[in-house]
Swiss-Prot record:
Pfam hit, one: PEPCK_GTP
Required co-factors: Mn(2+)
Protein name per UniProt: Phosphoenolpyruvate carboxykinase [GTP]
One Gene Ontology cellular component: cytosol
InterPro entries, alphabetized: PEP_carboxykin_GTP_CS (IPR018091), PEP_carboxykinase_C (IPR013035), PEP_carboxykinase_GTP (IPR008209), PEP_carboxykinase_GTP_C (IPR035077), PEP_carboxykinase_GTP_N (IPR035078), PEP_carboxykinase_N (IPR008210)
Quaternary assembly: Monomer.
Cofactor binding note: Binds 1 Mn(2+) ion per subunit.
GO BP term (any one): oxaloacetate metabolic process
Cited CDD domains: PEPCK_GTP
UniProt key word Nuclease: no
Length: 611
């Protein structure tokens, strides 16, 4: 039997008993209690270099940075192997995979039995959210992957201090992770152990996460999507708060007024770029600061305002497409102490990925560790960087404020070649929830005259809601109604809700809106709408700006171009609203009646409008 040997700084009997229980099941060769120290980090990095999991990069160009190359079969989240095992199938809903918890436990017990043989079990304590914040939650991950242990040190507040907050009886979310490849005595390990059979399992009632077979990102760093979205969304519903797939940014105008915005976009729609936006020419005196680029936990305050924290402490960003033009702040964040995964590397130890530079460097080794061949991808399309958020030059002074930052507006956006205008403001909270619930994003780049397939991704939470999506909509509606009463009593208002679409195309299939820093122009209008300063025109689908309502200083973007990305085609909108029925039917009878009513009213308004 493996000796548990809990260190003195762990004073939580229930936690120690749980570690012992999992050790008896998984049978690791030894147990290490992580303390989050620099010495421990370096020791684990050196261990992985010796194992061939990691390589040291050029320390002049990339100080303190390392590269890991995963197994080619283990490169992304596995949505089809991700389960929400609630007691009742209906509580998981139609958009999640479900299995009876008793059946799943039996299955996983078989898989986890002896799964850590020959390996070290790392006990990784972490806080999602600033230590001690009333919005934060603690997790403990038991993993046999040193890659997970070092990555969690960057992605969460990881180490000894977590045990001080936990004390002798504090609550924690138990997370168990194994790569699922036990080692027999004397057997040589592979550089990236993983198992073809994978399970990422959540038990919402008992707040447990079990992950088997993958060493990669969101499947293995269990504080990220598993805890911070799937389990936290269940907690939020029970306790009256929100766990959302949203960036948080701060906007300060030249007069010193500051607003915080939370924005939800599906993957590959530019969340990180938007969170780290640099205002363009013509916006001197404006400042954008980053609180978070991926996840927001939002709790109502006594004053009826919604306060958000970024539960993470790092960025786990997609590398391809990131460069000094698209995201200079992100590139500056990567100046040191980065763990790269599945990017390419030059013969002198510098990283490279598609979009980093126009020229492909000579003598490149691709993400599979082979010489790069032109015409193939050098970096995997989902190649990642893991880096501490505190290194970001645009990081907000209040990014670790335990009370959170007050949200003035929510933005929802997807990738649509037509139909959806550049920006629109919802009529009210219910209308905003309807728009977020029915938002869609194209899965394929739209060819000329051919629309990409629109996948509905409600609130950009389709892969991440830990319970029935219809109940999730209901939670947003109820929270709005409750908070609205408090807000009115304190002289505050609910955040306004906006929809954006940076991706409208012209007849030739080209993007019309320049995006990136130019999105500041839309952001300014949104802020001014929150302040009651900006004009808008009422249309059947929401309030929209005219060309004159936006600030065009420093750009030559024409009224004709603006009209192209803001026009509302009546037939397209009738088709669009009618297509929402497919999602609503899928979600079944728990769908809030208010959303069905909103759909009928919208459809009628659009049909009555002149084109």
């Amino acid at each position: 039997m493996t000796t548990v040997n809990a260190p003195e700084f762990v004073r939580h009997p229930k936690l120690i008993a749980w570690v012992e229980e999992i050790a008896n099941l998984t049978k690791p060769a030894k147990i290490e209690w992580c303390d989050g120290s620099e010495e421990e980090y370096q020791r684990l990095i050196d261990l992985m270099i010796a194992n061939g999991t990691m390589q040291k990069l050029n320390q002049e160009k990339h100080p303190g940075s390392y590269l890991a190359n995963s197994d080619p079969s283990d490169v992304a989240r596995v949505e089809d192997r991700t389960y929400i095992c609630s007691q009742n199938k209906e509580d998981a809903g139609a958009t999640n995979n479900w299995e009876d918890p008793a059946v799943m436990r039996e299955k996983l017990n078989g898989l986890f039995e002896g799964s850590m043989k020959g390996r070290t079990m790392y006990v990784v304590p972490f806080s999602m959210g600033p230590l001690g914040s009333h919005i934060a939650h603690i997790g403990i991950e038991l993993t046999d992957s040193p890659y997970v242990a070092v990555s969690m040190r960057k992605m969460a507040r990881m180490g000894k201090a977590v045990y001080d907050v936990l004390g002798t009886d504090g609550e924690f979310v138990p997370c168990v992770h194994t790569v699922g490849t036990p080692l027999a005595e004397g057997q040589k390990d592979v550089a990236w152990p993983c198992n073809p059979e994978k399970y990422i399992v959540h038990y919402p009632e008992t707040r447990e996460i079990w992950s088997f077979g993958s060493g990669y990102g969101g499947n293995a760093l269990l504080g990220k999507k598993c805890l911070a979205l799937r389990i936290a969304s269940v907690m939020g519903r029970e306790q009256g708060w929100l766990a959302e797939h949203m960036l948080i940014l701060g906007v300060t105008n030249p007069q010193g007024e500051k607003h915080y915005i939370a924005a939800a976009f599906p993957s590959a729609c530019g969340k990180t770029n938007f969170a780290m936006l640099i205002p363009p020419a013509g916006y001197e005196g404006w400042k954008i600061e980053t609180v978070g680029d991926d996840i927001a936990w939002i709790k109502p305050g006594e004053d009826g305002r919604l306060y958000a924290i970024n539960p993470e402490a790092g960025f786990f960003g997609v590398a391809p497409g990131t460069n000094t033009k698209t995201n200079p702040n992100c590139m500056a964040t990567l100046h040191k102490d980065v763990i790269y995964t599945n990017v390419a590397v030059t013969d002198d130890g510098q990283v490279w990925w598609e979009g980093l530079s126009k020229e492909v460097p000579a003598n490149l080794t691709n993400w599979k560790g082979q010489p790069h061949v032109n015409g193939e991808k050098a970096a995997h399309p989902n190649a990642r960087f893991t880096v501490a958020a505190g290194q970001c030059p645009s990081i907000d002074a209040d990014w670790e404020n335990p009370a959170g930052v007050p949200i003035s507006a929510f933005i929802f956006g997807g990738r649509r070649a037509d139909t959806v205008p550049l920006v629109s403001e919802a009529f009210d909270w219910v209308d905003g929830v309807y728009k977020a619930a029915t938002m869609g994003s194209e899965t394929t780049a739209a060819a000329v005259g051919q629309q990409g397939i629109v996948r509905r991704d409600p609130f950009a939470m389709l892969p991440f809601a830990g319970y029935n999506m219809a109940d999730y909509f209901d939670h947003w509606l109820n929270l709005g109604a409750k908070v609205s009463e408090k807000a009115e009593a304190s002289g505050n208002k609910l955040p306004k809700i906006f929809n954006v679409n940076w991706f409208r195309r012209d007849a030739e299939g080209n993007f019309v809106w320049p995006g990136f820093g130019q999105n500041m122009r839309v952001l300014e209008w949104i802020i001014d709408r929150c302040e009651g300063r900006a004009n808008a025109v009422e249309t059947p689908i929401g309030f929209v700006p005219t060309y004159e309502d936006l600030n065009w200083e420093g750009t030559e973007f024409t009224k004709e171009q603006f009209d192209l990305i803001t026009n509302q085609d009546k037939d397209q909108w009738v088709t669009e609203i009618e297509s929402h029925t497919e999602l609503f039917n899928k979600l079944g009878e728990r769908l809030p009646k208010a959303l069905k009513e909103r759909q009928a009213a919208l459809l009628e308004a659009v049909k009555l409008a002149s084109n």
